[in-house]
Amino acid sequence: MKTTHAVWERENLGVDAYEIALDASDTPDLLRQEERRIVAAGAEYIVVKTPVDCPALLFSMQSLGYTYVETVFHVMIRRDEYHMPASIARFDRGLSVVERTEAADRERIYGLIRRGVFKSDRVSIDPFFGREKGGNRYANWLRGMLERGGS
């Protein structure tokens, strides 16, 4: 089990958030203990990530008060082995990539994101938060990444 105090979510969501990543050796009782600890520390929003191959954890989440919200896939493509099918490659013609470095361009893009580009992530579909908070979260994530020199 790995617990992360998601301090960045205070700005994004307005709550003190924690993320708990479980592994195959964890149990519902261990999760309950960790949950009590972080609630005592001020947790207002808790995200629990479970491995897909652990039915004991997956099927206990609802009885612990959690709601299944999203599945995350991790995809890797070995570029040297990948050949794009012609049916997909045809959509790539005529596209261009433009780096936006001006502050006004970035603010315009952040505004587009805040208005609801993302509709199906766990924050946007949560009735407590909604699409506005979800958009704000992604815009802040992008802004922070660019400020740290990411691309």
Where are these regions (language model features)?
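Short amphipathic alpha-helix that is part of the acyltransferase structural core
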Residues: 15-23, 89-136
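Short amphipathic alpha-helical segments, especially helix-boundary/capping motifs
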Residues: 9-11, 32-35, 84-86, 114-120
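Acyl-donor-binding surface of acyltransferase catalytic domains
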Residues: 22-105
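Active-site rim helix/loop that mediates acceptor-substrate recognition in acyltransferases
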Residues: 55-57, 129-151
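Conserved beta-strand in the GNAT
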Residues: 1-6, 74
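STAS-typified acidic loop motif
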Residues: 4-29
